[in-house]
A protein has these predicted regions:
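Zn2+-dependent metallopeptidase catalytic domains
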Residues: 1-196
């Protein structure tokens, strides 16, 4: 079983995912008129399922983003790049969104939330038991492989992995634990843009 728990709402969510998948597969298999929503859904699904094309493309689809990231030479260039990447759903250090004010649901606020750690929980970076260390080592191997797939040789990929782990570990140390994240009062720090 892949779930730590599986209640009635989880079952509903899983059934919903399966129904949506069935709809998408049916749409993608059909003949859809050019420019229709069905054609767009089918195209994106078929593209995502075409592993031969994806492997042949390599990093080409994200090459422009990689070049922008590589071109950053000064800290002042990071925030504008983060804003640009956010348009593609990439939030490197923290996430932000507009949502209801938890103290006044009639009001929406621009909200920031911790992020920047790929392993999900801060303990994966900070704990040193055998299981956690093994997970962290596998993650390091994954980072090296991703950099190699992006065109870096093994030595450069390992150096970049060390930089990634250093940054993510520092972010993890500054992050709230899962328990702290569940405390609404500890996570509510309403302020103006000037105060931010």
């Amino acid at each position: 079983n892949e779930y730590s728990r599986f209640g009635s709402f989880d079952m509903l969510a899983e059934n919903n995912r399966e129904q949506l998948k069935g709809l998408i597969v049916d749409i993608a298999a059909g003949q859809n008129a050019q420019g229709t929503i069905g054609q767009k859904i089918g195209d994106i699904y078929n593209l995502a399922m075409d592993s031969v094309k994806l492997n042949a493309d390599g990093v080409t689809p994200i090459q422009a983003d990689l070049e922008k990231i590589a071109s950053v030479k000064d800290k002042s260039e990071i925030v504008p790049l983060m804003a640009e990447l956010a348009h593609s759903g990439v939030f490197p250090y923290f996430s932000f969104y507009v949502g209801a004010d938890i103290m006044d649901s009639k009001s929406n606020l621009f909200q920031l939330y911790q992020g920047g750690i790929s392993l999900g929980e801060r303990e994966y970076y900070l704990d040193n038991d055998d299981v956690t260390t093994n997970i962290r080592n596998k993650y390091k191997e994954h980072i090296v492989k991703m950099f190699q797939l992006a065109g870096f040789d093994e030595a450069a990929a390992k150096k970049k992995m060390e930089a990634v782990m250093d940054i993510e570990t520092r972010i993890a140390k500054a992050s709230f634990s899962a328990v702290e994240q569940r405390n609404p009062a500890a996570n509510y720090h309403k302020m103006s843009l000037d105060e931010l």
